[in-house]
Amino acid sequence: MPSCAYCCSCGPKMPALQLLFLACLVWGMGARTAQFRKANDRSGRCQYTFTVASPSESSCPREDQAMSAIQDLQRDSSIQHADLESTKARVRSLESLLHQMTSGGVTGTQEVQEGLQGQLGALRRERDQLETQTRDLEVAYNNLLRDKSALEEEKRQLEQENKDLARRLEGSSQEVARLRRGQCPSTHHPSQDMLPGSREVSQWNLDTLAFQELKSELTEVPASQILKNQSGHPRSKEGDKGCGVLMWVGEPVTLRTAETITGKYGVWMRDPKPTHPYTQETTWRIDTVGTGIRQVFEYSQISQFEQGYPSKVHVLPQALESTGAVVYSGSLYFQGAESRTVLRYELNTETVKAEKEIPGAGYHGQFPYAWGGYTDIDLAVDESGLWVIYSTEETRGAIVLSKLNPENLELESTWETNIRKQSVANAFVICGILYTVSSYSSVHATINFAYDTNTGISKTLTIPFKNRYKYSSMVDYNPLERKLFAWDNFNMVTYDIKLSEM
């Protein structure tokens, strides 16, 4: 190195110069990781240069690739520049001592040696500090490069996800637009007397849930093939309107299949005593999976029910419990969530007209049917009106049957049976007779008990009842159509029945 050559030319026989030569060798060994160079510039002034090589880069990065990191390194470089100036000052002091030695001979050699040793030790410490700081800067720089690469990769992934989401949204929008172009026009408009805000909520639910409804499929027998009369659904023969005892239940006929998970079990119904503006075709449906169940889908026409286009979505002011709801004379009757209260909700005005506690009735899992589902309180309709099926602590889980006033929900009459509620899967009433289903999952279930409120006598039966889809969560009787309505594992089905004369 030039600095070493300069030192050695001053006289190798002198001890001080030998020590300085040793310092030059030590300095040269340290130059493997850093270089300290001394040279004259164009104007003849002496300049000292300290150089550090990058351990990982063959060339310097562009300014636009690591501007932030470079700015940080520049701040650290200014600190090191100050340290370097201090080192230069010490070197100048060392040169001054050498000059004294060369001009003054051997005089004061001991003092000069001590001064040189002190200066050499200080220079070594300065060099070690600078090397440590340089390594720290290299590590920090490498970390910044890694962080920059990671951020760029994350940005690329987010951009790709954004493109995928935009593509999916566009596809969904096109599908919804296509489906809506074929949607049946709504024929029923919300009442002007509906609860404040319910119109907006109903419309919102129609927009978001109709798309799921559109995916529902008809299976087994198309509903259009079994709708034989002008009104759009089967009717009893004119001479077959009298009451009787249940003798036979036909094969299940599937009208609709719900695809969404909320359709695992639920309740669907038509009004056996319809009032304006509703007709014999108007159908209601409630998916009862989950909690906070408040949505009631209304279909004004059979075709809307077939195709999955609700004409309206009611939002109940209070959540309902399980699958025991019925529609009768223009009102929806249901059990309030986690309570023994039965409510009457007038569908046309969207208002609660009456509510009443069923005295002592078990609720929320105390006395459900065999399949569970919080089916403690089950409402039913027959030729004579509205009924409620439940149990109490006093009857130790046996079924209690009460006749309800449809206007104010007062109990008019009550019967206690000897049929344990949790031993049967479901129950319904025909002509004042309570019938129970033996199993909710067996394909070869039976109508196994009957309790006659006219005589107070119960008896066992073995009328075949097929659970085709092996999870019947609701069975109700419609006296207008003389059919059983059921919800069997996502499927809305009906059963023809035969009654004998009483």
From Swiss-Prot:
Induction: Up-regulated by dexamethasone. GO terms for molecular function: fibronectin binding; frizzled binding; metal ion binding; myosin light chain binding; receptor tyrosine kinase binding. It holds the Pfam family OLF. InterPro entries: Olfac-like_dom, Olfactomedin-like_domain. One of its GO terms (biological process) is regulation of MAPK cascade. Residues 242-501 form the Olfactomedin-like domain. Ca(2+) binds at residues 378, 426-427, 475-476. It is found in: Secreted; Golgi apparatus; Cytoplasmic vesicle; Secreted, Extracellular space. Highly expressed in skeletal muscle and retina. Also detected at lower levels in thyroid gland but not in other endocrine glands such as the adrenal or pituitary glands. The keyword Glycoprotein applies. Palmitoylated. Undergoes a calcium-dependent proteolytic cleavage at Gln-225 by CAPN2 in the endoplasmic reticulum. The result is the production of two fragments, one of 35 kDa containing the C-terminal olfactomedin-like domain, and another of 20 kDa containing the N-terminal leucine zipper-like domain. Residues 82-183 form a coiled coil. Residues 166-198 are annotated as: Disordered. One of its GO terms (cellular component) is collagen-containing extracellular matrix. Glycans are attached at residue 229. Disulfide bonds join 243-431. The record marks 225-226 as: Cleavage. Its main location: secreted. Residues 1-31 form the signal peptide. Keywords: Calcium, Cell projection, Cilium, Coiled coil, Cytoplasmic vesicle, Disulfide bond, Endoplasmic reticulum, Extracellular matrix, Glycoprotein, Golgi apparatus, Lipoprotein, Membrane, Metal-binding, Mitochondrion, Mitochondrion inner membrane, Mitochondrion outer membrane, Palmitate, Secreted, Signal. Homodimer (via N-terminus). Can also form higher oligomers. Interacts with OLFM3, FN1, NRCAM, GLDN and NFASC. Interacts (via N-terminus) with MYL2. Interacts with SFRP1, FRZB, FZD7, FZD10, FZD1 and WIF1; regulates Wnt signaling. Interacts with SNTA1; regulates muscle hypertrophy. Interacts with ERBB2 and ERBB3; activates ERBB2-ERBB3 signaling pathway. Interacts with SNCG; affects its secretion and its aggregation. Secreted glycoprotein regulating the activation of different signaling pathways in adjacent cells to control different processes including cell adhesion, cell-matrix adhesion, cytoskeleton organization and cell migration. Promotes substrate adhesion, spreading and formation of focal contacts. Negatively regulates cell-matrix adhesion and stress fiber assembly through Rho protein signal transduction. Modulates the organization of actin cytoskeleton by stimulating the formation of stress fibers through interactions with components of Wnt signaling pathways. This is Myocilin.
